[in-house]
Amino acid sequence: MVLQDLPDKKLSFNRTIKYGDLVIVYEKHDAMKAVMVSEDGVVQNRFGAFQHSDWTGKPFGSKVFGHKGGFVYLLAPTPELWTLVLSHRTQILYIADISFVIMYLEIVPGCLVLESGTGSGSLTTSLARAVAPTGHVFTFDFHEQRAASARISQFSHFSQFRHNQPVQSISVLPNRLFVVAN
């Protein structure tokens, strides 16, 4: 079952960085972090200080230099990178397992997915990308802080994060639910 296109749901193909964007700051293969770009923001690390204002207007993937001459790369937040940089508030699934879940459940664009247990949001962001642009992920977590923290990913406009038990909230879902993933 594939849903009709919903005009208010669009993937953003804007490849330049602007204020409010989530950016993955890549120092080296084992040193990355997610940063929300803000007007007064600064990232400081062993390579120098990097002003967020220097990032705006640059394309994702750019190499930017700090005031000491060091550099970092500014990467777009894909689900794969998000899984590597997110705060592990719970045990998470990694890309190999996520790929198997999505394939096994035949999750494709247009599906509606119910996820019970948002956790750190690793699976949620990959599910949201898999169902985009016409599908939707409804995810529930009983822990309020985990549900709130998971909302910041780039794919959050394809997901609804709720703080409560899914059984208590099932009545608020549309009657077009296609896939249920635990």
Please name every model-derived segment:
Residues 140-182:
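S-adenosyl-L-methionine
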Residues 92-112:
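Conserved alpha-helix/loop element of class I SAM-dependent methyltransferases that forms part
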Residues 120-133:
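Conserved SAM-binding loop of SAM-dependent methyltransferases across substrates and taxa
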Residues 1-76:
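N-terminal auxiliary segments of SAM/dcSAM-dependent transferases
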Residues 3, 12-15, 85-99:
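Conserved SAM-binding loop and adjacent beta-strand
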Residues 65-89, 97:
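Terminal, basic amphipathic appendages of nucleotide-handling enzymes
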Residues 108-119, 138:
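Conserved class I S-adenosyl-L-methionine
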